[in-house]
Amino acid sequence: MAKQIEGVYENVLRCARQEFLEKGFALASLRDIAKAAGTSTGSIYTRFTDKAGLFRALVEPAAGELKRRFLEIQESFHQFDGQTQQEEMGRYTAHAQEGLFDYIYEHLPEFELLLRRAAGTEYAHYIDELVEIEVSYTYKYMEAVGYPARMEGALTEQLLHIVTTSRFESIFEVIRHGMSRA
């Protein structure tokens, strides 16, 4: 097996990030990335398998970690009894959301790719995955606190999905528009 040249991997990632940010996944060219990185497309295929693998290498660490943290927050909250959940919901949510925002802004280039340039990748529906997690745990919360709208059928699955999606879209819209954390 041929020895890989030191620094090429990092350089390819740097050039790929720029290419994907400028053109999006669908229009990005491995040839252009290889040229900018001073390597060959074969070198990229050896390291990343394909364009999707290269995109994944850029976004998965941050995307996976945010999802892991989000699930951990949900799980830890749902360890509380129903009364504690009801009493602590606002405070707990605000604190957790602040931590997630901090993480997103610490990994802003990755989330810009994920939110603005992922069409055509396995990450194109990343927000939908977060929405499904939130909807699932919202139902658990409603059961734990005996939320009457859920019990009486006034809150449909479709309405909850719409409201949750709009909340997530509004949160991530600030990233799409390049707004600073301050």
Located regions from the model:
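C-terminal/domain-terminus segments
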Residues: R17, L114-V131, A182
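Hydrophobic/aromatic-rich alpha-helical bundle segments in the mid-to-C-terminal region
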Residues: L113, Y141-A182
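Hydrophobic alpha-helical connector segments
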Residues: A57, L71-Y103
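Helix-turn-helix
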Residues: N11, C15, E19-G53, A57
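Alpha-helical DNA-contacting segments of helix-turn-helix folds
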Residues: R56-E65
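N-terminal intrinsically disordered/low-complexity leader segments
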Residues: M1-I5
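Amphipathic alpha-helical packing segments from all-alpha helical-bundle domains
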Residues: H95, G99-E106, T121-Y147, Q158-T165
